[in-house]
A protein has these predicted regions:
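Conserved ATP-dependent motor core of P-loop NTPases, especially the RecA-like helicase ATPase domain
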Residues: 16-18, 50, 54-61, 71-268, ...
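Core structural elements
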Residues: 94-107, 161-185, 336-341, 357-370, ...
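Conserved helicase/translocase P-loop NTPase motor core
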Residues: 100-106, 335-389, 402, 538-561, ...
Length: 726
């Protein structure tokens, strides 16, 4: 049986109500969650059937892993207690356990309650490409209608965003606004709150507070550099008359600005920012340490850049000037809200006409079903009684819609078990809102200090995965960069990673340290034979790995717990874009005799070049498949631009894209060339096997040469040849 830490034991055993577990990287959170489930199933006083638990994970893969872990744990328990009928029953029920993603949960709920929602229960989910195309078509129709019915507010919006040019920016803003508000439980209500806020002025508004906070953070950053510069100059008599007066003046101005930002009115802040001036540094020709002078100048330049940014970006206008600007921009913003609502209506209608929905719809379907007038509905109360506990993993990556769903199903959080780590929130681009996790973290009390029934928190801060050298480096970095204004969390000892692994016999050995290897990519030039940045980084990484292997760098064997020389299989290279960069790293490693492989998520069919071939084969079979057809035309094989594709679509939006091509072939020579090649391939396919058709495609389009000329061309060519061989 594992030896649990006190905090892990609390997370496993606590039954006092809502519990938030802040689980640092490598803290054993999955093992803790699995053990908590097992303990609930086998509790002698209050056992729970597994189908009375709802376990929500972030991905399908995580849900499958959780089901497998729980099944394995139950299997081991049954093996140890073969006569325990209750355990055997739970093992039998594992396949019925509600271990799911939030979208799968919402999909199931929407299908069951389709009649209430007024939709068909057999609706389908659109994929990302179909959704993107449909949004573009709907947006175009909405803009056409808006131009036909334009009023002064709409023209004000156009003037603000288009400057008399094309309306691409207008469309981008409408779509961007629409997509962002989908993270709110009631997007329409949110927009109406924004509309109401436009009738008020003054900088004591959410927008004004954000501007002040941004300026405050920047001013603190710049002032810190001035403090360092003044400290460095103190005691150097040769520079007392040259540099110190100007820097002291800078520092005084920075502190006056900070005083205003922390305690003054808005106009006080603007006045302080506008009054900032920069005295000249007197030449110090006799001072010999020129590098030191450059360092001081760089610190001052940092402050000057910050001060200029504050004046130009955040503290740009007084309250009176802001009121004047509001009068000019409010009509445009009213029009933007109206346009977003119009797009929402049209997009919803288009999806319904196709009996389709997207992932945002699933979440909002659930909110509609689970809430009535802002309170949990009768359905929500009925469903909440089905679950003894709801456990949600990766809670830092939830948004407001998902949080509302979990609250409705958990009797307003009274039986909600949440696990996450705000430091690992990486899905802001998907509208995740880590502030939800932070608000709970700050408002929930420590378990030891909070009565049962009240929301509580426990921190799993010990890392059982890494050496002290790794953790110390991480803590050093994050303590420096994280704060209330960056990361929304002050990185104290409570949030830091603490050593939990006691199985490294080499712990404390000075040779185990964190290294930072820097590549100077400046001056690479434009020579075709010159290595690019990725190649240089790969070469340096390969060189360092070669050195580790040659010296027999000692590592701990996972099986024996003893030291042995490192092997290539012990080493992993983490890349932000492995699909594009991994081939370069593999080539550099193999060049110096190190065997390497890369795990390409999604496999061969997910690569851009092979995916294009699959789409082209599909189009040859049936050209009236808009998504595949447009994807092929945009690919390097045919090189149509987005503007060209849009012009073709404008021929007639009511027909398929292929039919639009047929109608426009005489007007666009590029379309005629494309259709001739497609017609040839369709004819060729009638009496030839697929492998010959594929090679004909390679030959007709020059695919191997085209993709070979792109970055990582050799790997792309290899992918195409592998696809052909299969």
């Amino acid at each position: 049986m594992p030896k649990w830490t006190p905090d892990q034991q609390t997370a496993i055993d606590d039954r006092g109500g809502a519990l938030l577990v802040s689980a640092a990287a490598g803290s054993g959170k999955t093992a803790v969650l699995t053990e908590r489930v097992l303990r609930r199933l086998t509790d002698e006083k209050d056992p729970v059937d597994i189908d009375r638990l709802l376990l929500v994970t972030f991905t399908n893969a995580a849900a499958a892993e959780m089901r497998e872990r729980i099944g394995a744990a139950l299997g081991a328990a049954v093996a140890a207690n073969p006569r325990d009928t209750r355990l055997r029953r739970q093992l039998f029920l594992v396949h019925r356990a509600k271990i799911t993603t939030v979208h799968a949960l919402c999909l199931s709920l929407a299908r069951e309650q389709a009649a209430v929602l007024g939709i068909a229960p057999d609706f389908r989910l659109m994929d990302e490409n179909e959704g993107k195309l449909l949004r573009a078509e709907v947006l175009e129709e909405v803009l056409d209608t808006a131009y036909e019915q334009a009023d002064e507010k709409f023209f004000a919006l156009c003037d603000l965003l288009t400057a008399g040019r094309d309306d691409q920016k207008l469309g981008e803003v409408i779509l961007g606004t629409y997509e962002k508000i989908q993270a709110h439980p009631d997007p329409r209500a949110f927009l109406e709150d924004v509309r109401a806020g436009l009738y008020t002025c003054g900088m004591d508004t959410p927008h004004g507070r954000v501007l002040r906070e941004q300026a405050r953070s920047a001013a603190q950053h710049g002032a810190a550099f001035l403090h360092m510069a003044v400290d460095e100059l103190t005691g150097i008599d040769e520079l007392a008359d040259n540099y110190l007066p100007a820097l002291t003046s800078d520092l005084n101005q920075a502190e006056r600005l900070l005083d205003a930002l922390f305690g003054g009115s808005w106009d006080d802040c603007v006045k302080a920012a506008r009054s900032i001036s920069f005295d000249r540094l007197k030449a110090a020709r006799k001072f010999e340490d020129k590098a030191f002078l450059e360092q001081i100048k760089a610190m001052r330049e940092e402050w000057k850049g910050v001060a200029n940014n504050i004046r130009e970006k955040w503290l740009t206008v007084t309250a009176e000037e802001a009121e004047y600007d509001r009068g000019l921009t409010a009509p445009a913003l009213f029009a933007l809200i109206d346009m977003v609502n119009a797009f929402d209506d049209a997009f919803t209608a288009a999806k319904r006409a196709r009996n389709a929905a997207d992932f945002n719809d699933l979440e909002h379907f659930a909110v509609r079903l689970l809430y009535t007038d802002g309170k949990p509905s009768a359905l929500a109360k009925t469903m909440s009684e089905q679950f003894t506990e709801i456990a949600v993993d990766e809670y830092q990556d939830t948004n407001a819609v998902q949080d509302a769903i979990f609250r409705a199903l958990s009797r307003d959080e009274t039986n909600l078990f949440m696990v996450g780590d705000v430091k690992q929130s990486i899905y802001g681009f998907r509208l995740a809102d880590p502030s939800i996790f932070l608000e709970k973290y700050r408002s929930f009390g420590e378990v030891a200090d909070t009565a049962d029934g009240q929301p509580r928190r426990v921190v799993l801060g010990q890392n059982f995965r890494s050496r002290a050298a790794v953790l110390d480096a991480c803590n050093y970095l994050f303590a420096a960069v994280m704060g209330e204004t960056v990361g929304d969390l002050v990185y104290t000892d409570k949030e830091a990673l603490h050593l939990g692994a006691d199985y490294y016999p080499e712990s404390g050995n000075a040779r185990y340290k964190t290294e930072v290897l820097l590549v100077d990519a400046d001056g690479l030039g434009e020579d075709d034979d010159a290595p690019d940045k990725t190649e240089l980084e790969a070469r340096l990484a390969a060189k360092r790995i070669r050195a580790l292997l040659d010296e027999g760098f000692p590592v701990t064997d996972k099986q024996t717990g003893k030291l042995r020389p490192v092997t290539p299989g012990d080493i992993v290279i983490l890349l932000r874009s492995p699909r594009n960069k991994a081939p370069t790293y593999i080539a550099e490693l193999e060049r110096i005799g190190i065997t390497a492989s890369a795990e390409q998520r999604g496999g061969l069919l997910e690569t851009a070049e092979v995916g294009t071939m699959v789409s082209l084969l599909s189009v040859i079979d049936n050209p009236r498949q808009d998504v595949d057809l447009i994807g092929v035309m945009r690919s390097p094989l045919f090189g149509f631009t987005e503007q060209e594709l849009a012009d073709i679509r404008l021929v007639d939006r009511r027909i398929s894209y292929y039919d639009a091509l047929l109608q426009s072939r005489t007007d666009f020579p590029k379309v005629e060339t494309f259709l001739q090649r497609l017609d040839f391939l369709r004819t060729f396919a009638c009496d030839q096997p697929v492998y010959r058709l594929l090679w004909e495609i390679y030959d007709q389009t020059g695919a191997l040469g085209l993709y070979g000329a792109l970055p990582n061309g050799a790997q792309r060519q290899s992918n195409l040849l592998t696809f052909f061989e299969r």
